Amino acid sequence: MSLSALESTINSAFDARDGISTSTKGEVREAVDQVLETLDKGEARVAERGADGKWKVNQWLKKAVLLSFRLNDMGVIPGGPGQATWWDKVPSKFEGWGENRFRDAGFRAVPGAVVRRSAFIAKNVVLMPSFVNLGAYVDESTMVDTWATVGSCAQIGKRVHISGGAGIGGVLEPLQAEPVIIEDDCFIGARSEVAEGVIVRKGAVLAMGVFLGASTKIVDRDTGEVFIGEVPEYSVVVPGALPGKPMKNGHIGPSTACAVIVKRVDERTRSKTSINELLRD
């Protein structure tokens, strides 16, 4: 089926999803399987960046992923330590892979790396023991470091470094929610968390322990400008706090966590300066 035919079939099936189960056969199952394969190969992606810098979300692809949970039964997944098994509906991306398949794919997957089928991993990516969920897209030359997670349908750009223990949130439900997007050349510091559809624009640097959600205020220290839901390109961001407001008893209330843009750099400076130097105040 063409992508337009797939989209029509998936949208219709999703509207009638209460009637879809593991016993469903025919066109719907074939369409969902084809979509998952297309996502897995990177031939389609849940979100695409336009020439104007705006991201378009292909909601129907997310619907296909959701339908797969209704269509697919639980099953034993082999490959655990000590010949243990797992019990799930989503097989490993690497099921049945041998040396030739890995060489053709062109990325590294260190023992302990888990990637679920329908996630795309581009060439020269390095996956340390980490987790990449279904529908995600990880572009070329990116590092997903130890115990980092890339959530469902998240979009990770080229030459991104996702440091140890960092979390990139996933989003399948609510269906209208936007996926988390990390654009090219970003650095996500250790134990940071980016969730709830936040966009981190090109070349931005998040220090260790920065937490960003849809309502997190991102304050530019120099200008006082406040951003919500998006980190401007080439920003250097650290954890911070906004002063508390006076309470009814006259005392100052508790402070509120925020993120602080401590500086902005241009592309040339970003490419020539180490992360540690950028984060020094």
Swiss-Prot record:
It is found in: Cytoplasm. GO terms for cellular component: cytoplasm. Pathway: Amino-acid biosynthesis; L-lysine biosynthesis via DAP pathway; LL-2,6-diaminopimelate from (S)-tetrahydrodipicolinate (succinylase route): step 1/3. Gene3D superfamilies: Hexapeptide repeat proteins (2.160.10.10), Tetrahydrodipicolinate-N-succinyltransferase, N-terminal domain (1.10.166.10). InterPro entries: DapD_Trfase_Hexpep_rpt_fam, Hexapep, THP_succinylTrfase_dom1, THP_succinylTrfase_N_sf, Trimer_LpxA-like_sf. It is an enzyme of class 2 (transferase). NCBIfam families: dapD (TIGR00965), PRK11830.1 (NF008808). HAMAP family: DapD (MF_00811). This is 2,3,4,5-tetrahydropyridine-2,6-dicarboxylate N-succinyltransferase. The gene is dapD.
